[in-house]
């Protein structure tokens, strides 16, 4: 059996240069992430990792928060070089001293290496101590002029495979306003102005995924008119969401109970968007009334 290869990115660099944003970005890219890994534990940790998937990926922040960082990191990296089945890279995040000082002041943090409390002195000492590690790094990113969003985009371009770099998933869901708006929704649309199948006895206990309800909802002229305007609004903005580095866009369609109208609209929207995008369909409250009746 061919041994699976472990892909590791060691995230390090200057304090305040963006390591927190970086590790969150790697998580979005499908990496298993750990923040503040003591260097001495790294080889043992990698040995204990159970590789369950092809080409597993890890991203670990290793920095000066560990007191033994400067004394241990070189020996650890030498050991990793000789470890079979491991492909590892070092990502070093840097920024200009002036920008780092501004970031420390903005967060009201003191620099851990500034014995006298002067942030700039701590930064200069840190830069001197990290110089050998920076020279070893395969990827050095200067975040001086980067916003968090721009840093995420930069890392996605450098560490995603081609399929991931182009990935963008749309979640289309239905819900009932009476149960609350989904907290993770990016776009919310209200279809409560449309005729409600609930008031037709033969349709009341069905849902928008059932053909009779779907046809009833979508065959009304006002439904078709609204849907065409909805599609014309959504389709042109999807590339912009993708360009900005958003990995998941959640579109929520709501009606009163989330059983009929919103379900039908979500179903149709999925059918159309799926022609050009990766789309998942979900109906949060579709069966809620049925479950309530069964419990009573």
UniProtKB/Swiss-Prot annotation:
* Binding residues annotated for ATP, in chain numbering: 13-20
Give the GO molecular function terms: ATP binding; GTP binding; molecular adaptor activity
Instruction: Read off the InterPro entries from this record.
Output: P-loop_NTPase, RapZ-like, RapZ-like_N, RapZ_C
- Note the Gene3D superfamilies from the entry: P-loop containing nucleotide triphosphate hydrolases (3.40.50.300)
One Pfam family cited in the UniProt record for this chain: PapZ_C
Q: Does the keyword Transmembrane apply?
A: no
State the UniProt keywords alphabetically: ATP-binding, GTP-binding, Nucleotide-binding
Q: Does the keyword GTP-binding apply?
A: yes
User: What positions does the entry give for GTP binding?
Assistant: 63-66
Q: What the protein does?
A: Displays ATPase and GTPase activities.
Q: Which family does it belong to?
A: Belongs to the RapZ-like family.
User: Under which name does UniProt file this protein?
Assistant: Nucleotide-binding protein spr1424
């Amino acid at each position: 059996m061919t041994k699976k290869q472990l892909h590791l990115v060691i995230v390090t660099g200057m304090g305040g240069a963006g390591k927190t944003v970086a590790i969150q970005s790697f998580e979005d890219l499908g990496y298993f992430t750990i923040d503040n890994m003591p260097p001495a534990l790294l080889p043992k940790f990698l040995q204990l990792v159970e590789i369950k998937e092809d080409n597993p990926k890890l991203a670990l922040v290793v920095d000066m928060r560990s007191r033994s960082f400067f004394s241990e990191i070189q020996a650890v990296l030498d050991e990793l070089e000789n470890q079979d089945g491991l492909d590892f890279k070092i990502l070093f995040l840097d920024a200009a001293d002036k920008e780092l000082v501004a970031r420390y002041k903005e967060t009201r943090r003191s620099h851990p290496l500034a014995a006298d409390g002067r942030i700039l002195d701590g930064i200069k000492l840190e830069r001197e101590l990290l110089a050998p590690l920076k020279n070893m790094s395969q990827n050095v990113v200067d975040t001086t002029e980067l916003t968090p969003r721009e840093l995420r985009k930069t890392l996605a371009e450098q560490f995603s495979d081609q399929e991931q770099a182009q990935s963008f998933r749309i979640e289309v869901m239905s819900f009932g306003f009476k149960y609350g708006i989904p907290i993770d929704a990016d776009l919310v649309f209200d279809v409560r102005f449309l005729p409600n199948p609930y008031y037709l006895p033969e349709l009341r206990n069905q849902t928008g995924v059932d053909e009779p309800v779907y046809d009833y909802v979508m065959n009304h002229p006002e439904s078709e008119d609204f849907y065409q305007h909805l599609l014309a609004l959504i389709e042109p903005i999807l590339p912009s969401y993708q360009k900005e580095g958003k990995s998941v866009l959640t579109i929520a369609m709501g009606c009163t109970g989330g059983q009929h109208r919103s379900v039908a609209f979500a179903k149709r929207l999925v059918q159309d968007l799926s022609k050009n995008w990766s789309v998942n369909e979900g109906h949060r409250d579709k069966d809620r009334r049925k479950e309530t009746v069964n419990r009573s």
